[in-house]
């Protein structure tokens, strides 16, 4: 499934990750929790995280 994630789903995952970290969850723990919640690998989560940061996805819009 994770290889076919649409952009809206990737943005949802990124937003959930940012929200978890904004709630003072440690980065490593937030990555594990969000990967588990969405059923994706840690590697895929990191790809999505990088994509979101590089493209200024919400909540980091210009």
Regions picked out by a protein language model, each given a short descriptive name:
Residues 6-29:
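Short, amphipathic alpha-helical "recognition" segments used to contact nucleic acids or chromatin
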Residues 30-35:
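Short alpha-helical "recognition helix" segments of helix-turn-helix
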Residues 49:
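DNA major-groove recognition helix of helix-turn-helix
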Residues 20, 52-53:
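The DNA-recognition helices of helix-turn-helix-type DNA-binding domains
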